[in-house]
Amino acid sequence: MLKQIKSDIYHLLHPKMAFFLTSVSKNDKPNVMTCAWATPVSEEPPVVIVCVSKESYTAELIKQTKEFVINIPTKKLLGALWICGKISGRDTDKFKRAGLKIIKAKKVKSPVIDGCVGHIECKVWKTVDAGECYAFFGNVISAYADEKYMRNGLWTKEAEIPLHLGGARIVYFR
Ligand SMILES: Cc1cc2nc3c(=O)[nH]c(=O)nc-3n(C[C@H](O)[C@H](O)[C@H](O)COP(=O)(O)O)c2cc1C
């Protein structure tokens, strides 16, 4: 029997990959938050959307500098993923708190997170007010992945990428 779903309707669309979304302020101060709401929307040109709460510091920064980086982690970074998803970078250095090392990105000022297996650097070309979130449409400027975990353009099961089911539940891509 099909049961009517009245709350957390979005859980029907999970699991979704949980990743680190990095951004930067006008004066080059970086931030990171955990994000799961993202999707490709165009292959040619390559465009992705990230959906970010209007209340987050990340939304403020992306609106300021119009860029972001998607950093895809493995199981090893699960602890950091929770930390970056629970506290705001407004008054905390989350990189330090979560023990994350940053590296310079190739084409944008937002940093890349060391130990992640895939990165998508984006410049925002359109922002849509989507209710409680902004949907930031990002033109993909550069994308690269660890060849140990991505073969022939596909993730291998060794990558063990965290997939968010909802709430505190994570499963792994295997
Ligand atoms: C697994 C997981 C997935 C999340 N996905 C999103 C998301 O897709 N969009 C969003 O706005 N917040 C999401 N969050 C919540 C943000 O990470 C959280 O509000 C964070 O503290 C914002 O940080 P900031 O204020 O430094 O930007 C998620 C949290 C977790 C733990």
Per-region residue spans from a language model:
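Basic, polyanion-binding surface patches
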Residues: 1-174
